[in-house]
């Protein structure tokens, strides 16, 4: 079994790392449960605020529910947004959090409304993008909570089994990290000399271009879990960018001589050439990962290294350009070697 396909069995287990702690009991008769749950009419409550009616068409329910970008959750706003989303559902958009999805969480947890498991189950049954296995686990989870055997907060991501919804959950996890990470980046930049600050925007742009190239070209995007893998890689790269800022600031990188740099550069070039020489037939087993994508990513990385060198000269004069470039090469070499190892299996 090739590496690009070895996660297939794992993807069927509802153990999304950021949320789920144990596999819940499954409701094998979930279709009958849902059929009964949908019989009772549901009336939207009168909601006075805090969002104005004009804000509802563009509201982002995940932002209000999870609180990323606004410091803390606002369940009253999430409730408004979710009810609006349910009333204006777009069946062509695969968003499990839209409308009924977030209503499931709000009513299951009693966030912004009295806890109501009957409604939570009803809304869970309205989710059109959930796999059958996902519904078995989700309905079983809610029934376990209603019976008082599970008191932990409920989240849709506890029970995901499909690649599509794993991607949605990873996107939430990434967004939750982004706010705190950005605050740390801002803190690193705030004390830099103005000459460095003027170069930071260009560095950030080069970093973004590399992150998108790396995640889009060197991670297999062919499976249903592609969204999750893409978001995971973007999160990893963003975390590494912050680590780089912190380590260069603290001078916490190995001192490299010109000879060291030449050796590392030679290793990187050898790894790159090895990948470029892999027969075309070999790449067929690895989905969207192709030599041309690696080449595009490498070009973006070279621009990023140059941007780091210009920025580092002003921001970290105590760190030699040789040491800075060597550290960046080490990180890229690890990525190249991981690709080569994948192809060798």
What feature does the model see in each segment?
Residues 10-21:
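Hydrophobic h-region of N-terminal signal peptides that target proteins for export
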Residues 1-8:
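Bacterial N-terminal signal peptides that target proteins for export
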Residues 21-345:
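N-terminal alpha-helical modules
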